[in-house]
Curated annotation (Swiss-Prot):
Post-translational modification: Phosphorylated by mitogen-activated protein kinases pmk-2 and pmk-3. May be responsive to osmotic stress.
Keyword Ligase: no
Disulfide bonds: none
Main localization category: nucleus
DNA-binding among keywords: yes
Descriptive protein name: Transcription factor atf-2
Segments of this protein annotated with the region Disordered: 19-78, 181-256, 273-345
Region span, Basic motif 2: 335-360
Coiled coil stretches, renumbered: 361-388
Chain segments carrying region Basic motif 1: 60-85
SUPFAM superfamilies: Leucine zipper domain
Length: 401
């Protein structure tokens, strides 16, 4: 060995030393890897588990967002359908009111006698025994238009007057049953469709406590009651024709409360006011945490999305971490609480809007039905009075040939 090492040149000895050091370093690295064993593998497994958890988290977020998007779209379609129905009913209501207020009444072709005309007693044998003989002079004196001609205008003029200037006459008890039924029908409702909408007059009377939105505000535990909201106004109505022979009883007809067309202003006042919940105190860490900006909650944001977005700010905040509030900071707890309050107010506003629209649709449908009934009744009454005028004209022409 010594002979071989001595016989070798310096360059060959240097190459042998380098190769030996390389072999020693490779063997030492292999032994170190073998001695460590499983720690790199366990670290790799933990990384994979965290990635899987994050994938589950994002999958859950994606499904939640898809469900929220579908819910918003469905609610938007329902709102559009409800608004379209309200617009159609409002247009029909206005058309019926205009038709009821401007009903074309043909003028009679016969000439009316003077109001001071006194019909004398006529003998029974003056006229032949025919259809005219059934018309007695005593029966003609009971016609209400002849008795009240010097005090009130004719019925044709009454139909053209404003409802505030109509004085309802009290006719005799011998009136025909058709007029009695028509008058009783008109006196059964305390709200007349003749009255137009007057904000100056209706502002003097306040709406009763049966308002839909007021009920929602009182019944909802999520909204405060210290906000001064404008109350809708109710306009008093009066029947066009009172019941014949006796005044209309006050206890029999039930007052029909009609909705005043102040919906957009009420809803804007309802939704624009900030209504903090009275059951939860104000935030104690608003100024400390710097989160004193007002919560931006809109009706388009769904409840599940608002709660899920507040409950998950990053993938590291899993559901297990959120269930334990003891390890969270006061800023996080306060932010969660205020977000939940905003979601409650949003739900209360949405529920109030939905119930208001439903109630308005019901009121418009009922009012339109009443207007149709009144129009048909007025047409029948006009036809009846035209026949009465024709009979009176025939009698007058027979008495004065």
């Amino acid at each position: 060995m010594d002979v071989d090492s001595a016989s070798l040149s310096p360059s060959s000895r240097l190459s042998v030393v380098c190769s030996a050091s390389a072999e020693f370093s490779s063997s030492s690295s292999d032994s170190s890897n073998f001695s460590e064993g499983s720690p790199p593998e366990s670290r790799r497994n933990s990384v994979n588990e965290s990635v899987i958890k994050d994938e589950h988290y994002w999958e859950r977020r994606r499904r939640n967002n898809d469900a929220s998007r579908r819910s918003r779209e469905k609610r938007r379609q329902n709102d559009l359908a409800m608004e379209e129905k309200i617009m159609l009913l409002s247009a029909e209501n206005e058309r019926l009111k205009s038709q009821l207020g401007t009903t074309p009444i043909p003028q009679p072709s016969v000439t009316e006698p003077p109001t001071s005309l006194i019909i004398p007693q006529v003998a029974k044998n003056l006229f032949p025994a025919g259809p005219i003989a059934s018309l007695q002079a005593s029966s003609m004196l009971t016609v209400p238009l002849l008795q009240a001609a010097s005090h009130i205008p004719s019925m044709l003029q009454l139909c053209q007057l404003q409802p505030t200037t109509i004085q309802s006459p009290v006719y005799a008890s011998t009136q025909q049953p058709a007029s009695t039924s028509a008058s009783s029908l008109f006196s059964s409702s305390s709200s007349s469709a003749f009255h137009p909408f007057r904000p100056s007059e209706s502002a003097q009377q306040s709406f009763p406590s049966s308002s839909v939105i007021v009920k929602i505000e009182r019944r909802s535990p999520d909204s405060s009651t210290d906000v001064n909201m404008p109350q809708p106004q109710l306009q008093p109505g009066s029947s066009v024709i009172q019941q014949i022979g006796q005044p209309a009883p006050s206890g029999t007809p039930q007052p029909v409360i009609q909705a005043v067309q102040q919906g957009p202003s009420l809803l804007s006042a309802l939704l624009s006011q900030r209504r903090p919940s009275p059951t939860v105190p104000q935030s104690r860490t608003e100024h400390i945490s710097g989160l004193n900006s007002p919560p931006r909650h809109t009706g388009n944001k769904s409840d599940c999305e608002s709660v899920s977005s507040s409950a998950s700010f990053s993938p590291s905040h899993s559901s297990e971490d959120h269930s334990n509030y003891s390890n969270k900071s006061p800023q996080y707890v306060d932010r969660r609480r205020r977000n939940n309050e905003a979601a409650k107010r949003c739900r209360a506003n949405r529920r109030a809007v939905f119930e208001y629209r439903s109630r308005r649709v019901q009121l418009l449908e009922g009012e339109n039905e009443d207007l149709r009934t009144q129009i048909e009744t007025l047409k029948a009454e006009i036809a009846h009075f035209k026949s009465v005028l024709a009979q009176r004209a025939s009698v007058v022409t027979a008495l004065h040939p």
